[in-house]
From Swiss-Prot:
Gene name for this UniProt entry: rpsD
Subunit structure: Part of the 30S ribosomal subunit. Contacts protein S5. The interaction surface between S4 and S5 is involved in control of translational fidelity.
Name used for this protein in its record: Small ribosomal subunit protein uS4
Alphabetized SMART domains for the sequence: Ribosomal_S4 (SM01390), S4 (SM00363)
One Gene Ontology cellular component: small ribosomal subunit
UniProt entry keywords in alphabetical sequence: Ribonucleoprotein, Ribosomal protein, RNA-binding, rRNA-binding
Gene3D superfamilies assigned: Ribosomal Protein S4 Delta 41, Chain A, domain 1 (1.10.1050.10), RNA-binding S4 domain (3.10.290.10)
Length: 210
């Protein structure tokens, strides 16, 4: 499947928020240098940014969420259709589907420092689900599933570094992690109150409902 392989900082700055595409717990400003011409201060042109239309705001929110989870447009729309056909609030179900992706769960458990790195671990068969090798990043993890790093991959430096970052960042309440054994349990689907507050999923619902 095609993936964006360009500058990650560029995407975060375009969306005006840290999409956590680069590892580390530092703020975006210290992870990425400002995109500006040499010797030119940001905003030196004196131009006021154009005001986005309602559609523009909705589109930006969709792009922000899609890029955060590393999902291409076709698959993102598929997630929305599935959420819309499910019981419950469409926006919340959409976020639960995104959070339930195996690559995202691997990231949340601290086995990968970014979702992109977690996706690589999955594709390289370094991750087991209930003792079975799964190499599909979009695999939907179910409550009660056991996720762990394959034994021969536990000594990888990137896995150790990722866990150190996760310990500083903290773990989400819907997962349980044994940071010594590098294994965890997906206890339940996340509640909306536990999901990122900076995401406004209602804007995405409005966009696709047109």
């Amino acid at each position: 499947m095609a993936r964006y392989i360009g500058p990650k900082c560029k995407l975060s700055r375009r969306e005006g928020t840290d999409l956590f595409l680069k590892s580390g717990i530092r703020p975006l400003e210290s992870k990425c240098k400002a995109d500006q011409a040499p010797g030119q201060a940001a905003g030196a042109s004196g131009r006021r940014p154009a005001r986005l239309s309602d559609y523009g705001v909705q589109l930006r929110e969709k792009q922000k969420v899609r890029r955060t989870y590393g999902v291409l447009e076709k698959q993102f729309r598929s997630y929305y259709k599935k959420a819309a056909a499910s019981k419950g609030a469409t926006g919340e179900v959409l976020l639960q589907l995104l959070e339930g992706r195996l690559d995202n769960v691997v990231y949340r458990m601290g086995f990968g420092s970014t979702r992109s790195e977690a996706r690589q671990l999955v594709s390289h068969r370094a991750i087991l689900v209930n003792g079975q090798s799964v190499n599909v990043a979009s695999y939907q993890v179910k409550p009660g599933d056991q996720i762990n790093v394959r034994e021969k991959s536990k000594n990888q430096l990137r896995v150790k570094n990722a866990m150190e970052l996760a310990q500083q960042r903290g773990f989400m309440p819907w997962i349980e992690v044994d940071d010594k054994k590098l294994e965890g349990t997906y206890k339940a689907k996340p509640e909306r109150i536990d999901l990122p507050a900076e995401i406004n999923e209602n804007l995405i619902v409005e966009l696709y409902s047109k």
